[in-house]
């Protein structure tokens, strides 16, 4: 009998922790990202910021906007604008579905994390709905309660 293939943890490069706090994530999609030669070197070094980023569907193409990838320190002439829009590589039906979902009021696409998979940079895009302030407080209260329960269980054993 063949052994089960164990999945390695993703080679995580960056994570957008603020997105989980500010948004309710409805669905996620994995997308490739079109990068230039020096950009991929900076990404592999972990020199990127997803915090203010978002994705947009334009002309039946998905674009990642407002994501900062620092210029590669050795790239000089070949470096590009750190804040440029980057194309997301998705199937046509996925782009069409995302376009329909984001057409609703209050729904947006946010990058959740960027990682390497088989040598290629991938972005996990979340279809997100904005939280209200009372929702954020409610989430924090629930997390505090869960933490207290875990402490009590840990002290018990």
From Swiss-Prot:
Positions of disulphide bridges: none
Record-level GO BP terms: trans-translation
Protein species of origin: Lacticaseibacillus paracasei (strain ATCC 334 / BCRC 17002 / CCUG 31169 / CIP 107868 / KCTC 3260 / NRRL B-441)
Protein name: SsrA-binding protein
One Pfam family, short name: SmpB
Function: Required for rescue of stalled ribosomes mediated by trans-translation. Binds to transfer-messenger RNA (tmRNA), required for stable association of tmRNA with ribosomes. tmRNA and SmpB together mimic tRNA shape, replacing the anticodon stem-loop with SmpB. tmRNA is encoded by the ssrA gene; the 2 termini fold to resemble tRNA(Ala) and it encodes a 'tag peptide', a short internal open reading frame. During trans-translation Ala-aminoacylated tmRNA acts like a tRNA, entering the A-site of stalled ribosomes, displacing the stalled mRNA.
Domain of life assignment: Bacteria
Subcellular location: Cytoplasm
InterPro entries: SmpB, SsrA-bd_prot, SsrA-bd_prot_CS
GO cellular component: cytosol
CDD domains in the cross-refs: SmpB
